[in-house]
Design a protein with these regions (language model features):
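An N-terminal, well-structured beta->alpha segment
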Residues: 5-100, 194-216
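Gly/Ser/Thr-enriched, mixed-charge loops and adjacent short helices
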Residues: 14, 30-35, 39, 148-269, ...
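Conserved phosphate/anionic-ligand binding catalytic regions in large, soluble enzymes, centered on
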Residues: 37-55, 223-231, 383-387, 393-402
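N-terminal small/polar loop signature for handling phosphorylated ligands or for N-terminal nucleophile
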Residues: 84-147, 242-292
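Proline/glycine-rich low-complexity loops and linkers
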Residues: 115, 174-196, 299-383, 390
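Phosphate/diphosphate-binding loops
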Residues: 129-157, 165-173, 261-285, 316-319, ...
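Mobile "lid/hinge" segments at catalytic clefts and subdomain interfaces of large enzymes
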Residues: 168, 387, 396-404, 408-429
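Single conserved hydrophobic/aromatic residue that forms the stacking wall/gate
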Residues: 436-447
């Protein structure tokens, strides 16, 4: 079927709002772009520009993926299947989550749907905590406001790896009739979740706490209009934290930034300006789904932005210093192949085993699952150069909540010694830089 035939097909079955959007299109190239292919379901799930069409994120493409995923889960033959669903602050995220919940419920699955926006690591944790068979997170990470996405997690709270994603894709591709999608607005199989699960997540994060001595460390935090505001402030409640008010509340248009990506200096401009006014020591910024965190550190009258490699290496040293007595021959650090060797060499100096994975945090999560199954190794910390870190096994995805807590505790620990994180990084370079050939490889921009 060519794009024109697909366009006419959609005009026949679409709801009034979708049909009106399609009928308003006058640019043939735009029509072609919306229908020349189906939105691809890859190892990261769905991700695309929102709008009407088979190559866009909308209730129909979400519905197709959900029906296919439901059929895939039912093919296992397991009874009483359960799915956890959460969503971020993006436009249409809550609607897409409700669409998915209704379809899963109509297919006979029990759905545990968050009653509020929450971070990605909360969904990963909840999938495990409620013993679900799968999880779905509606998010497009730090992409521009026009985008949204649909991430799929397995029963362990890990994003689907290659084999499972391929198996699910077969069932999704088999859905070729949008009229067959069992949309449903309400169903007895949909169970709201919220306070209890979020409290359990916070408790799990706080079990990773490493330094709680009083400190006069001053922090400026921005959730960049995303999901981090509540959970990050909860784990930092005993520290001196001020929030960038204009970026505090959820806003799917990300009105104050060009891009809500904490890798980019522009995203932290307002936070750094506030930090200068308040003479804060540390700036934290989490992306909209709060799985990545960027930092800027006061250095004299200016603020220095750290890369993911730098922050990760400092976290490795801090965590291992604080947990040195708990380390054993099984203790393992996991990093991706594009992440610098600085943290790995710090890990080796503490006697840790080092494992490398392909790019994408799901591979780090998969390693944690393997360690639990075999008992051969014990996960201590995992990270990637694109600002994603995990300490603890409460989740199987990168977690900016636990990372923010530990970064602030690390900064407080150093400040109580009369040092900044810049001082700490310089000391790390002096001690470990001679052990590696390349300290800061060029960062490969991408989505994980």
């Amino acid at each position: 079927m060519n794009y024109k035939e697909k366009y006419r097909q959609w005009l026949d079955f679409a709801d009034p709002d979708t049909k009106a959007e399609l009928e308003s299109l006058t640019d043939e190239k735009e029509i072609e772009d919306r229908f020349y292919k189906d939105l691809a379901f890859g190892t990261g799930g769905l991700r695309g520009i929102m709008g009407a069409g088979s190559n866009r994120m909308n209730r129909y493409t979400v519905g197709k993926a959900t029906l296919g995923l439901a059929n895939y889960l039912k093919s296992t033959g397991k009874a009483d299947l359960k799915v956890a669903i959460a969503y971020d602050s993006r436009n249409n995220s809550a609607d897409f989550a409700k669409t998915a919940a209704g379809i899963f419920a109509n297919c006979g699955l029990h759905v545990y749907l968050y009653d509020r926006l929450v971070p990605v690591p909360v969904l990963s944790f909840t999938t495990r905590y409620l013993h679900c068979d799968a999880g779905v997170m509606i998010t497009a990470s730090h992409n521009p406001k026009e985008y949204n996405g649909y991430k799929v997690y397995d029963a362990k709270g890990c994003q689907l790896c290659t084999a499972d994603a391929a198996a699910a894709l077969d069932y999704i591709n088999a859905v070729d009739d949008y009229n067959a999608i069992p949309f449903c607005n309400d169903h007895a199989n949909i169970h709201p979740v919220g306070d209890r699960e979020l409290d359990a997540f916070i408790a799990a994060v706080e079990q990773q706490s490493l330094y709680t001595q009083p400190s006069d460390l001053k922090i400026v935090y921005t959730p960049l209009h995303g999901t981090g505001n509540v959970p990050v402030r909860r784990v930092l409640r005993n520290m001196h934290v001020s929030v960038v008010k204009s970026q505090e509340l959820p806003d799917g248009n990300f009105s104050t930034v060009r891009s809500p990506n904490p890798e980019e200096k522009d995203a932290l401009t307002l936070a750094i300006a506030q930090a200068k006014a308040e003479e804060a020591d540390l700036v934290l910024g989490t992306d909209p789904d709060c799985d990545r965190v960027g930092i800027a550190v006061r250095d004299g009258d200016d603020y220095v932005l750290f890369t993911g490699n730098q922050t990760g290496a400092l976290l490795v040293q801090f965590v291992l210093t604080m947990k040195k007595a708990q380390m054993n021959e099984k203790s393992t650090l996991v990093k991706t192949i594009v992440t610098s060797d600085l943290g790995a060499n710090i890990g080796r100096s503490f006697g840790l085993q080092i494992e490398e994975t392909l790019t994408g945090f799901k591979y780090i999560g998969d390693k944690i699952n393997t360690y639990e199954q075999t008992g051969d190794k014990e996960f201590v910390i995992g990270y990637e150069e694109s600002y994603g870190y995990l300490v603890g096994t409460h989740a199987r995805d990168k977690d900016a909540v636990v990372s923010a807590m530990l970064i602030c505790q690390m900064a407080a620990w150093y400040k109580n010694q009369g040092k900044t994180l810049v001082d700490a990084l310089n000391a790390v370079y002096e001690e470990y830089l001679s052990l590696i050939h390349i300290s800061e490889p060029t960062r490969r921009r991408g989505i994980s």
